C-alpha cells in the first residue's frame, strides 16, 4: 500500500500537469494574429456559416475551418497560421487588409468564392507567402504593385476575376515565381519587359484580357518557361518575333486570336515544343518547311490567310494528334500520306481539320477508327464519283457535331433521395455521385467521335481505378473555341454512396494532377470538385491542427503524468526491495535444455572477451532492448551484441521462444541472428555486424558522405523486401511495429537490412479476404513521427501500420528530412509540394543527378503508404512492385564492386570504423536525367 504522503504527492503532480494544459495553450498563439482572423471573418459574408467556429478558442487548437498551423518552437515557442484555406465556401464580401498581419502565412487560398473589392495591398507584407490563390472571384481594381515584394511566392493565381489596370513592373522581382496565372480578367496595357527576368517562371498565362502593344521579344530569354499562353488579347498589328524560335524549354505556345500579322517564324529549334496554336489571326505567307519538334502533338493554324501547301515535313511528325488548317487559302491536293504513313501508331488518336482549302484530293480517303478527317468546303465534297466519301460523309464532309451526352436524354423522374444518374443508354441509377467540372487540353476535342469518347472513358476510369460504367459524361461545353469544359459524374460501384477514403482518393487524384500520363487529353484544369450531400462534411474534418496531433499532445501529457506517478511509487518501494533485489539480475537461469537449430549459444565470457569486457569504446548504439556493442569473436568475425537491460529481461520460456522465432527468419534484407547468451542472468542476442551503420546517419546533414538517388532507391527496395518477408513468408507472420531509418542498417556493400524485429510483434492469423494478417489489439509502441495514426487511436495493429511507417522512411530517403521538421511533419511538407507540382523542391539536393519522373513516382508511392486510413494504403507486395519499377532503369551503383570487396574483407580488430565507400569513389554519373538541386526544406 502506498503511504498517504506519497499519494498526495502523486495527486498534486497530476492535477498541476492537467490544469496547466489550457493555460499553456492559451498563450502559445500570438494575439494579433487571432484579431486579424476575426477581422477577416467580420468582412466576409458567410451564408452557409462555414466559419461559425471562428468565434471562440484560438485558431490552432480549436479546429477553425480552413486554418492550418505549425509550431515555431525552435524560434519563439508559438504556433502560427501557416495556411488559410477557404476554397469554395460560398463566401462573399471583401478580403480584409488585416490578412497582411498573418506574417507566417505560406498559403492563402480563397479560390472560387464571390469575393469583391480590391486585392489587399497588405498581402505584399507576407514575406513567407508561397501560394496566393485568388482565382474564381469578383475582385476589382488593379493588381497591387506591393505583390512584387513576395520573394518566396511560387504561384500567383488571379484568373477569373474583374481585374483592370496593367501588370505591375514590380512583378519582375518575383524571383521564385513559377506559375503566373492572370487570365480571364480585363487587364490592359503592355506586357512588362521586366517579366523576362523571372528565372524560375514555368507558366505565363495571360489569355483573355485586353493586353495591347507588341509581343516582347525578351520573353524568349526566360530559361524555364514551358507554357506561354496569350490567347484573346489585342496585339493588333504586332508580329511574332523571330526570337520566339529560340525558347529553350517551351512546350506550349498559344497565341490564338491576338490580331497578329506577318509570317510564321521558324520554330524548328524549340526542341520540346508539342503544342502550337496561332489560329484566328491575320498571318500570311506559307507554312515553314523546316521540321518541327518530334514531340509535336497539336498544330492549330486555322482561320488565317496562309497560302501554299502543307509542308512535307508534317508527314514525319509521328506524335501528331491534331492538324487544323481550316479556313486558309492552301492549294494543291489533300496530302493523304499524312495519315496513311506507316510510321503512325495504329492506336494514336488523330484529327485533321482541312475544311475550306484544297482543290483536289488524291489517294484513298478511307481512314481507320483512330483518325477523324474534315474536308467540308473543299471541292472533293461536291464530287459524287469518289467512293468512300459517301460512306464517311458525316465525318468528312458534314458539319462537325458534338457527341451526345447523358444530359440530352435525362433519366425519368423516379423518387430518389439523391440523384438519378444515367450511366449508359437505358440505365439510370439512384446514387450520390461525385461531380467534377474541369477543362480539357485546348482546343481539339470538343467534337468527340465515338472512338475518342471510348478512349476518354478508359483514360479517366483507369486513372481513378474505377470501372468504365462508373463514369457519366454529363455535359460538354464549348467556351468560344477555347478549352472544352467537361462536366463529369462518378458513381459508386454496388452502393449508393462512396466511402470517405474513396472520396478523398478520387479528389486528391484530380487536385494533384496525378492521372495517367497522356498528351492527348491532358493537361487539364480543375474548376470545381464540390462535396455536397453526404460528402459535405468530409473536408471540415481536416481543418486546424490535425486531430491526431492534438491527441498525441494530450496522450503525451497523460503518459507523462503516468510516468511521474509510477516514478513516485517506485521511489517508495525501492528502499524496501533494495536488499532483496541485489541478486535478481545475477541469478542463474537454469540451463536451457533444448537446442535451437541454426544459432549458436555463447557463454557470457565469450561475449565479454569479444567486447573487452563490454568496454564503452565498443558501444555502438542503444535501443529499447538495451545497449548494442561491437564485438570481435575469436575467429575474427565482427558481430553486434544486444545486451538486454534489466527492464527488458524475459522469462526463460519467452526468451527461448524469441530465439526460436528469430532463428527461422532468413532473408537477405533482414539482419541475421548468429547466436545468443543466457548465462548468469544475462540475456544477449548476437547479430551480424553492419559496418555502414544505419540509414538515418547517412541522411544526416552532418554526414561526410551521402547516398545518391540510385542508392536510396535500392535501399528502399531492399528494406521493403525484408518487410514483405516478415508480413507474408515468416511463420508466424511478424509485424515490425517500429520501422524507421535508424532500424534499417547497411552492410559493407550498402545493401539494406531491416533490424529490431522480434516475438513481441507477432501478427495474428491471416484474414479471410485479402491474404494479409488481421489486426491485433496491443499497447501502442513505436516511434513518434513514424506511428500509424489509426494504430495510435484504436490500438489495433495491422501490417498496414508497417506500411505507414515505411512510407515515412521513403519520404526521409527522398528529402533527407527528419519526420518532424521545423514544427511540421514530413508528410505534410511533401504532400503540399506534390499537390502544387513542386515536389522536386523538397528533394534532397545531395542525391546528385536523377530523373525527375523517378523522384515524383517515389514521392507519390510514399504518400500512398502514408494515407490516413489503413485500407487505402498499398500492401507491401504492391510497394515492392512499385519500387522495382523505379529501380528498373536506375542501375545499382557500380561502387558495389571493387571498393566494397575491400571493405567487406576488412577484419582488423583494431579498426573501430570503416571508411565510407562514397569517400573513395565519385558518384556523379549513377543515374540518367537530372533535376535542379534544391536544398531540403
From Swiss-Prot:
Any keyword tRNA-binding? no
- On the tree of life, the source organism's domain of life is Eukaryota
LRR repeats mapped onto the chain: 102-126, 127-150, 152-173, 174-198, 200-222, 223-249, 251-270, 271-294, 296-316, 317-341, 343-360
Q: Which residues are glycosylated?
A: 50, 63, 90, 114, 162, 184, 210, 272, 295, 327, 357, 370, 413, 499, 516
Matching Gene3D superfamilies:
Phosphorylase Kinase, domain 1, Ribonuclease Inhibitor, Transferase(Phosphotransferase) domain 1
Instruction: Cite the Protein kinase domain residue spans from the record.
Output: 614-886
InterPro entries listed in its UniProt record: Kinase-like_dom_sf, Leu-rich_rpt, Leu-rich_rpt_typical-subtyp, LRR_dom_sf, LRR_N_plant-typ, Prot_kinase_dom, Protein_kinase_ATP_BS, Ser-Thr/Tyr_kinase_cat_dom
**SMART domains xref list:** LRR_TYP (SM00369), S_TKc (SM00220)
Bilayer disposition of the protein: Single-pass membrane protein
From the Swiss-Prot or TrEMBL record, give the protein name: Putative leucine-rich repeat receptor-like serine/threonine-protein kinase At3g53590
The beginning of the lineage is: Eukaryota, Viridiplantae, Streptophyta, Embryophyta, Tracheophyta
